[in-house]
């Protein structure tokens, strides 16, 4: 179990520690509470029979966050590029390949030897023979705890990062200034007056804005302004944005109180300037599409800016408030251990009923049956 941390602003907080804060609600929880109500409990860690969702590889998204928000140096320190077979055209892949290479060099070996044993023979007796398994093993030893990306992904990431930083609107947001320190994955943990634990993780906190990178996912191909608008609405990103605005306000309080953890001296000095020098800020999403050479998808970056106090900020705040009210009501009714359910009032179809079900017009059949008067009399 992760260590339970005190309220405060955290930099460089491990993902497992952030998500491991027992009972702390994040913005994704609020979106589920608003959109699914009681269904939130069933997908939460409170449900002992919860089924972990299948997650596709997230390394590309993590790497994009790192190279765009923290810079190339941070990306290269955190990620390692996997060996690519194309860079080792003469590598021995199969046992038969290794045997053939040893035979060419007149090296003696046991015919019944395992593949790994033959690789060791190559290391000692024929070091000029490249064994693919040995390349991978050496890479594993070298990479340590770093995450990995493929050679193709590394190239794509660098192209996308360059596109962001050279963008006429978004690029200047990331431009270095005296004392500027990149702030990525800013974690905020706090407690509401009624004891509800909260958490938020800001992709990047810049003086002029809070930024969030989002995947376009399976883009339908419709015009991007329409597609992105639908994504924001469907995924509850307006709620998330409003919650991030609230979290940043809390973060400013923690900065003033000295409740900042995990920051370097340079990061701490930079953070201390925010409350006075950046009292108001905007918000931007950077939607991206991962390139796919096979499907013919280009890397796409689609930035969206919103001012503090916008209409969607207001809508999102209302939804976040409603989500917390749902949480309070259900916790009071069911508690954390009993499954959350909902039984609606008895409804009727008849017109004028207080609780009415509304049928679609196409349910009607205009053709009378010969015996219908007798049948329904």
Which residue ranges define each predicted feature?
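Metal-dependent nuclease catalytic cores that hydrolyze phosphodiester bonds in DNA/RNA
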Residues: 1-199
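Extracellular structured ligand-interaction cores
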Residues: 59-61, 199-201, 208-210, 280-282
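Metal-dependent nuclease catalytic regions and adjoining charged, substrate-binding loops involved
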Residues: 233-238, 243-377
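Hydrophobic/aromatic-lined pockets within catalytic cores
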Residues: 68-73, 192, 215-218, 249-253
């Amino acid at each position: 179990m992760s260590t339970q941390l005190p309220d405060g602003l955290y930099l460089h907080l491990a993902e497992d520690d952030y998500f491991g804060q027992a009972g702390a609600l994040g913005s994704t929880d609020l979106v589920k509470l608003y959109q699914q109500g009681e269904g939130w409990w069933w997908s939460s860690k409170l449900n002992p029979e919860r089924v972990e969702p299948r997650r596709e590889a997230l390394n590309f998204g993590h790497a994009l966050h790192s190279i765009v928000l923290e810079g190339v140096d941070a990306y290269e320190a955190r990620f390692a590029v996997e060996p690519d077979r194309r860079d080792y055209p003469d590598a021995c892949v199969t046992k038969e390949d290794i045997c053939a290479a040893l035979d060419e060099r007149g090296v003696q070996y046991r015919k019944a030897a395992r593949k790994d044993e033959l690789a060791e023979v190559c290391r000692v007796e024929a070091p000029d023979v490249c064994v693919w398994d040995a390349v991978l093993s050496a890479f594993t030893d070298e990479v340590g705890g770093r995450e990995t990306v493929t050679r193709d992904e590394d190239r794509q990431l660098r192209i996308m990062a360059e596109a962001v930083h050279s963008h006429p609107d978004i690029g200047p947001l990331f431009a270095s200034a005296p004392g500027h320190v990149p702030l990525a994955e800013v974690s905020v943990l706090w407690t509401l007056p009624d004891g509800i634990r909260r958490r938020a993780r800001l992709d990047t906190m810049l003086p002029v804005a809070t930024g969030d990178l989002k995947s376009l996912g399976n883009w339908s191909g419709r015009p991007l302004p329409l597609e992105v608008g639908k994504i924001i609405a469907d995924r509850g990103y307006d709620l998330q944005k409003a919650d991030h605005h609230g979290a940043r306000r809390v973060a400013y309080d923690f900065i003033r109180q000295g409740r900042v953890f995990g920051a370097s001296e340079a990061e701490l000095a930079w953070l201390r300037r925010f409350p006075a020098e950046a009292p108001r800020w905007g918000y931007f999403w950077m939607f991206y599409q991962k390139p796919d050479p096979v499907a013919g998808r280009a890397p796409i970056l689609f930035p969206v800016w919103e001012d503090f106090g916008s209409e969607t900020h207001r809508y999102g705040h209302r939804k976040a408030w409603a989500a917390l009210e749902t949480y309070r009501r259900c916790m009071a009714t069911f508690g954390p251990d009993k499954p959350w359910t909902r039984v609606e009032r008895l409804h009727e179809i008849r017109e004028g009923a207080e609780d009415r079900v509304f049928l679609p017009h196409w349910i009607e059949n205009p053709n009378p049956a010969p015996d219908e008067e007798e049948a329904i009399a």
